[in-house]
Regions:
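Flexible domain-boundary/linker segments
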Residues: 27, 42, 46-49, 63, ...
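A short, surface-exposed loop/turn module that caps and links secondary-structure elements
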Residues: 31-56
Length: 88
């Protein structure tokens, strides 16, 4: 089981998501906790690789950006639409 910590930024952005997306995100969060590399999450390391940032899909449009704190703990940094999230 993966432990998840969140930043204030993540919590703020999560609260701003449309209700239907928040519901999907909650389900994906649980799935991530059970298996962070489940195929439906499309977990990937972002470029540049040295930043150590990763993402997974909430749905086709929305993503969660995170960083590994250690082998069993992830820090969710932010979330939002694909078009916006990759500009950070």
């Amino acid at each position: 089981m993966i432990a998840v910590e969140t930043t204030f930024e993540f919590e703020r952005r999560f609260a701003e998501l449309p209700a239907a997306v928040r519901k999907q995100a909650h389900k994906k969060w649980i799935l991530f906790s059970e298996n962070p590399y489940h195929p439906s999450l499309h977990t990937e390391k972002l470029h540049p690789k040295q930043r150590e940032l990763w993402s997974f899909r909430i749905n086709r449009q929305y993503r969660i950006i995170f960083r590994w704190l250690d082998a069993s703990t992830a820090l969710f940094l932010t979330c939002g639409p694909h078009s916006w999230i990759y500009r950070i």
